[in-house]
């Protein structure tokens, strides 16, 4: 019997002056960037957690500790490719990705096509199997005040070649 598994991932990082804003592997022009040990790409971190969780392989912190100097400033696309390798090694393939970025500022919509392209390349997945939505927090809370950005990702994985 074919195994089909669902994963869910979440990440949040604060916005600070002096960092590049990188989401989905796309550098977005803005006066602030996300603070973190790596490049702080909230979307790709949530994606890694969703994929690892679906395969019962732990979470991003287990595989890429924020106390490990090897991951200081690392491009999170490298982490996604490594997670993809782990899933493949475990006998799984990614079926689809559905993601939501929650940011009051800056606007994400113009950058979504590039994010989809990057994720499709890193997971060797057709772009049509990846959906990314952008929402605001309606000026509520930390995100609504422009102090941080959140990403949530749901994924479906399956063993073998067909669902």
From Swiss-Prot:
Reply yes or no: does the keyword Lyase apply. yes
Q: Which residues cross the membrane?
A: none
Which parts of the sequence bind a divalent metal cation? 11, 13, 45
Which example biological process does GO assign this protein?
A: isopentenyl diphosphate biosynthetic process, methylerythritol 4-phosphate pathway
Organism encoding this protein: Nitrosomonas europaea (strain ATCC 19718 / CIP 103999 / KCTC 2705 / NBRC 14298)
Give the record's family classification: Belongs to the IspF family.
Q: Which domain of life is it from?
A: Bacteria
Q: What is this protein called?
A: 2-C-methyl-D-erythritol 2,4-cyclodiphosphate synthase
